[in-house]
Regions:
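Generic recognition of short, well-ordered alpha-helical segments
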Residues: 15, 40-41, 70, 94, ...
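N-terminal Rossmann-like NAD(P)+-binding domain of SDR-like oxidoreductases, especially those catalyzing
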Residues: 1-182, 315, 319-322, 326-331, ...
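Short, surface-exposed alpha-helical segments at coil->helix boundaries
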Residues: 39, 43-46, 160, 194, ...
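Heptad-repeat alpha-helical coiled-coil signaling segments
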Residues: 181, 185, 214-216
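C-terminal substrate-binding subdomain of Rossmann-fold SDR/epimerase-dehydratase oxidoreductases
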Residues: 19, 60, 200-339
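Hydrophobic alpha-helix immediately C-terminal to the catalytic Tyr-X-X-X-Lys motif of short-chain
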Residues: 158, 162, 166, 196, ...
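A glycine/serine/threonine-rich, flexible loop-to-helix segment
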Residues: 137-138, 189-197
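Residue-level recognition of oxygen-bearing side chains
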Residues: 67, 98, 105, 144, ...
Length: 339
């Protein structure tokens, strides 16, 4: 099957592209390779994908409708997976316009191109951050999501609404993927676990917000990719015969929202403690107040995804951290830790 992936040189994009290529699919990647974080890391990811015969690539921004549309219409995919986005909750407070352009305009362009090319299924990456100040734990797809706390979260929720409108008007099958704190090898350097690792190794202080009184649903990259892969052929339909309890399927469109998470809460200090033990160094901790735009807790309910696909996350955070550290030490050529 021909699959078009935006953000192919990103963290999730790399792992997903590899999985699909190994499964025999034909993948066309699309990425701007911007400098929000280390471009060298993005290029290294691209070099891995470049070795696959069934992989092709276009460099471009999703905000550029002309390049994007040309690339999609030429490739003629059956499925589009839209992962490209300007990430980062804190950066969105400083540079909101960047998020409007990349996340909202970029997603609009993707949906327009998907409509023109008549794809069978469009999957759009969203985020657990859209749940915002929601107090219903664990988060279910049918919960209200009207209290976003950051510009990043607001742009993600906006794209969900835009996608639903298009799906309703043109009967375009769309699945929204709400990811929960993704981590693992080849991850993003702006993510907390990545920063913690770098600073612990450098014997520098790590900033811990809200005095560590928060938890996350840390989801290992392989589980995220497994969830997406299982959904490729699970196209939402207005004519679904069997009703599913707490289904987020729209009553007026072939549109569904799905959480992809680990379903286990991990307290921040426990995560840091595991990092310390595996690295063999104690972190120097700098306790800080809660940051603007951040949330104290995230936890997914993935019952709907399990009913539809049989999804069952396999990697606990201890194993996930171990796998991440193994990659980190190899990639950054850290041979020995001196205590």
């Amino acid at each position: 099957m021909k699959i078009f992936i935006t953000g192919s040189s990103g963290f999730i994009g790399l792992h997903l592209s590899q999985k699909l290529l190994n499964n025999g699919h034909i993948v066309h990647g699309f990425d701007s390779m911007n400098n929000y974080y280390d471009v060298k890391l993005k290029k290294s990811r691209y070099q891995i994908l470049k070795n696959f015969k069934k992989f092709s690539f276009t460099k471009g921004k999703v905000e550029n409708q002309k390049i994007l549309n040309k690339s999609i219409l030429r490739f003629k995919p059956k499925v589009i997976i839209h992962l490209a986005a300007q990430a980062g909750v804190r950066y969105s407070i400083k540079k909101p316009r960047t998020y409007i352009d990349s996340n909202i305009i970029g997603t609009y362009n993707i949906i327009e191109s998907a409509k023109k090319s008549k794809v069978k299924h469009l999957l759009i990456a969203s985020s657990s951050s859209v749940y915002g100040a929601n107090k219903n734990i664990p988060f279910k797809e049918v919960d209200k999501a009207d209290t976003q706390l950051s510009i990043y979260a607001a742009t993600k929720k906006s794209t969900e609404s835009l996608a639903h409108s298009y799906s309703s008007l043109w009967k375009l099958p769309i699945t929204i993927l709400r990811f929960f704190t993704v981590y693992g090898p080849w991850g993003r350097p702006d993510m907390a676990y990545f920063k913690f690792t770098k600073k612990i190794l450098a014997r520098k202080k790590i900033d811990i917000y809200n005095k560590g009184k928060m938890y996350r649903d840390y989801t290992y990259i392989d589980d995220i990719v497994d969830g997406i892969n299982k959904l490729l052929n699970k196209t939402p339909s207005l004519y679904q015969k069997k009703k599913i309890k707490n289904d987020s399927l729209s009553p007026v469109a072939p549109f569904r929202i799905l959480n992809i998470g680990n379903t286990r809460k991990v307290y921040l200090l426990d995560f840091i403690n595991t990092l310390e033990k595996m690295i063999g160094l104690k972190a120097k901790k700098n306790y800080m107040p809660m940051q603007k735009g951040d949330v104290k807790m995230t936890l997914s309910n993935t019952s709907l995804l399990k009913k539809i696909t049989g999804y069952n996350p396999k990697t606990n955070y201890q194993k996930g951290i171990k796998l991440f550290l193994k990659w980190y030490m190899q990639y950054y050529k850290i041979k020995k830790i001196k205590i």
